[in-house]
Amino acid sequence: MSFEHPGDGDSRYYLLKIAHEQFGCAPGELSEEQLQQAERIIGRQKHIEDAVLRCPDAAGVVIPASQIEEAWTQIANRYESAEALQQALDAQGLERVGMRAMLARELKVQAVLDCICAGLPEISDTDVSLYYFNHAEQFKVPARHKARHILVTINEDFPENTREAARTRIEAILKRLRGKPERFAEQAAKHSECPTAMQGGLLGEVVPGTLYPELDACLFQMAQGQLSPVLESPIGFHVLFCESVSTARQLTLEEILPRLRDRLQLRQRKAYQRKWLESLLQQNATLENLAHG
């Protein structure tokens, strides 16, 4: 079977794929602007794929049926049931056979792009070290404070949440906690008006700039095991509890070497593939101009 020249369903397949990947919705839910953007992406993608599949490097590339089946399974797993998948296909006028053909086409394009990178040099330890020391700021881990909070909101429409009542309530909670801070999660579960109450007020490991400025400024001055005073934000009154502190630090080269090597290798591959595609498209354009000249 040849996948170089897809049938009428190819655009519908691409639209389904791009709608989900780029916009997180079904094709029928795209706005007019999004639809136009999707159509431009589809046109460009098909143009590139056609060029790749016609190039000499594609001649010897064969995609095994097992790889196509694996790709199909990954798509099917995105849906709650086989019926939901079939409904999505029906809505786009797609058939399973056509979908598998399009998957095979995509896999072949990717296989060709992988093949052209086969001769690229491996990223060496020296390459990794040079990048690390020239971009040291990328490997700084900010300070993190693991924190919990209790929120009492201000809402003048409710007697128990007027500014005065809310302040009285939060101060009473803080008073109970001052002698027993280990009860913070329990008090948060009972009294906090934030959804985090379900997790005992847990905010998790917080980095600077995450919370309201009023809370942020206080939290990053707190020590482990410390309670904050009553703090006010635009939504109400808070009490914070700092469970642990991780200071800012610089990741060592040894810590990040394997991941950084993979990242640089991928960047090298992407850059090479981009240049190769640009050259291929330029050659095709030149040939087309000569043919029509």
Curated annotation (Swiss-Prot):
Q: Name one GO molecular function term.
A: peptidyl-prolyl cis-trans isomerase activity
Q: Does the keyword Ligase apply?
A: no
Q: What is its EC number?
A: 5.2.1.8
- Name a single GO biological process: nitrogen fixation
- Leader sequence segment: none
Q: What does this protein do?
A: Required for the activation and stabilization of the iron-component (NifH) of nitrogenase. Probable PPIase.
Which named protein is this? Putative peptidyl-prolyl cis-trans isomerase NifM
